[in-house]
Amino acid sequence: MKENIIQQKSFLFAIRIINLYKHLTAKKKEFVLSKQILRCGTSIGANIEESIGGRSDKEFLFKLELSYKEARETIYWLKLLKETDYITITEFKSVFVEAEEICKILAKIIITLKGKI
């Protein structure tokens, strides 16, 4: 089965988050915020994958809404990392743009699905 765009983007985003986590723990010796962003940044795609295996439209919607919330939380931790100088503005913008794009795609899917349920 071919992956859809949100599956692809969330998977690639998770890889970026894992690499950011490695950078933060190895180079910056930051272990608290980095764990938070690792958890929520990788759970976006995990929840999307779970939604695909959902038993009903409501379960599908619920998992997508969880993904959206995790994406918003990821943005929060990114902002904190930037404002506390753990990541540069350039590093922030690069990941932030992807997180925002994932949020927009998920929001559109959720709105469309709510209209059908």
Predicted feature residues:
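Short, C-terminally biased terminal segments at protein or domain edges
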Residues: 1-50, 54-117
